Amino acid sequence: MKIAFLTAGGIAPCLSASIGALIDSYNQLAPDAELMGYLNGYRGLLLGNNYDFPSSVRQKTDILFKYGGSPIGNSRVKLTNIDNCIKRGYVKEGQDPLKVAADQLVNDNVSILHTIGGDDTNTMAAQLSFYLKQHQYELTVVGLPKTVDNDVYLSLIHI
C-alpha cells in the first residue's frame, strides 16, 4: 500500500506536525506501507514531483513537531481552474487537471491521498474524490483541515 500526503494553501505552523503525526500513525498501523509526499501541493501532484519518505525520515519524525511550515512545500492550485493550470504549465491545452491528478495517483500506485489545507484545499480534495469515484478509480482521498478561519464546514462527507 502506498500513502501520499500533500499540503496546500497558505503556510501554517501545523503542517509539519500534521505530516509527522500521519507518519507516526502509519508507522504503527501499517509499518510496511510506502509513504510519499507530493512536493508543493497540487502542483506537485499535477507535475508528478514527489518525495518518498525513507525509513531514516520515518524514524525521526520528532523534528517535524518542532518546526512550522511544510517540509514538502505548498502551492495555491485549484484543479478546477483549468485556464490557470494551463497558463502555469501544470497541464497541457485540452487536459483536465482532475484527470491528470487522478492518472498521476494511479501511476504512482497511491491507495490513499491525505490533503492538508484550508477550505480551498479541502474543496479540491472533495472534487478530486468525486472525480475518482465517478470514473471508477480505486483511491481514497482524506482531507485534513488546516484553517484559522473556521471555514471548513463539513467534517465528514460521503460521496
Task: Please give the residue ranges for each predicted region.
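N-terminal phosphate-binding or glycine-rich loops at protein starts, especially the Walker A/P-loop
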Residues: 1-50
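Short glycine-rich or small-residue beta-strand-to-loop segments that form or flank ligand, phosphate
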Residues: 2-12, 71-73, 111-117, 143
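Short, ordered loop/turn segments at secondary-structure junctions
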Residues: 8-10, 38-44, 76-77, 118-121, ...
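Short glycine-/acidic-enriched loop or helix-start segments at secondary-structure transitions
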Residues: 15-16, 47, 124-126, 153
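Short Gly/Thr/Asp-enriched flexible loops that form oxyanion-binding sites at enzyme active sites
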Residues: 18-22, 117-135
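Glycine-rich nucleotide/cofactor/substrate-binding loop typically near the N-terminus or early
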Residues: 32-108
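Short, acidic/small-residue loops that bind anionic groups at enzyme active sites
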Residues: 129-154
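Conserved small/polar residues in nucleotide/adenosyl-binding loops
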Residues: 157-159
